[in-house]
Amino acid sequence: MEILACLEKSFVQISDLIRKTNSVNLGNLVDTHNASGDDVKTIDVMSNDIMKDNLSKCALIRTIGSEEEDEFYSTKFTDAPYLICYDPLDGSSNIDVNITTGTIFSVYEYDANNKIADGHSIVMSGYCLYGGATQYVLAYNNKISFYQYSAEDGLFQLLNDNLKMKEKGAIYSLNESNKKAWTDARFNQLIETFIEQKYTTRWGGKFSCRRAQNADQGWVFCLSRQPQGHRRQDSLAI
């Protein structure tokens, strides 16, 4: 699929950028905030430029939406069937301390009235991780596939064409520093039950990393309701 080829090209370029550039420089703040209210770093801008440049050349993409831009971008392909939305570098706040980062994306199909009705319009979504390896997970055509980049041949290799989450794990993931804001006693009891059953807690603030850990190890992920909470990333990749 042409869209996937453009995404893969972007993933490799962002991975190379992270690996080959001074991470302190990449972590420098730019004097602006993005659409989610986050501070913007140099790596955010550069990653967004990579994604936008590659995807705007794809004849299947009509519109591009990025967390780093306030407005949607219309490509020259005005009759193309798809809108793509992405966070070009989830976890950029950790770039200068060498913690795994990622790209989150979702592709929507316009209906007969040239509208995106709701989440049911999603035809493909996933995320790419930039860490010890460059890997991406793709939800498409009623299955989830897992790929890893091979620098030796310059291609992404399929590792698992039917990725499934474990039915039960032994880890739960949430930010317990927000405990005083929890208002539902049932949620507090749920966490106490996890502790009694000797679950281990893990928490990383970035969705792409959390989602990868949850899928691989069968974690329970909890996102408590917060007025300042970043629900955008999680909603995007569902």
Task: Please tell me what each predicted stretch does.
Residues 16-28:
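N-terminal glycine-rich anion-binding loops that anchor highly charged ligand groups
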Residues 80-143:
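DPxDG-like acidic metal-binding loop motif
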Residues 4-7, 11-14, 18, 33, ...:
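An extended, acidic
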Residues 51, 55, 103-107, 211:
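Buried hydrophobic packing segments
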